[in-house]
């Protein structure tokens, strides 16, 4: 009996090392799928093609790890959304409801569907998914100690930050500016700062949607500029062409007005020198052209159209 006991213990240890505690899924599979999904997320604002490749590989490689497949489906839904294939994006996010009972991935699916409804002006459905997301967030807060794994902790921070950013954008388009600012202010600063994707998104929305607070119109313009400049500079440093383009486009839009351009040339001349263009009346047009190059590199049809419009507006102002 005593000679068999150590063998019994060794057997348990080997079994535990082979299987994770996630629905008795092999540990090797969990690590592989989490790694692929992590790469899909890391590339989402760097290269949409690469993000899709890793998410699709994760989706196809799953045998038992259903919450990992749900995460891959959410990542694929993001890629479809950015490609403006809203029907496919909706189907992929809704597939998550069938794949898992993991509240975190279900929350991220709700938020993905909120984004689709906002973009396609489906207001009632937006609030349906938002209310569902709020209920899930409440349950997750009550059981936050369950998300101790580093991968899940990062997903948790992303989900909550994304919820408040998406809500803020929705309020902005409804011209409910104070509600939009309040939503952004609910993002814990440490959560936004730990995720470069969300940090860039946060600064970009604050600047492009003018969700900054100032008593004087001139000061408000300066704060918008500063948020967009931070977006551009950080995106260049971290190789995020999507936000590099958005930062440039937002700044070009601010400077389309000759009066605004003179204001920024006077008070932010040191920043304008960093773009590598002559600081003259054609600077907004050159910045819009560079933004267009970045959006083409990333293959973002929605922002490509916006860059063309800003370029045309800049030309009209100077005719």
Regions found by a protein language model. Give the residues of each.
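Bacterial N-terminal signal peptides that target proteins for export
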Residues: 1-9
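Short, intrinsically disordered/low-complexity patches at protein termini
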Residues: 5, 17, 267-269
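Bacterial N-terminal signal peptides
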Residues: 9-17
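A "functional boundary" signal
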Residues: 21-318
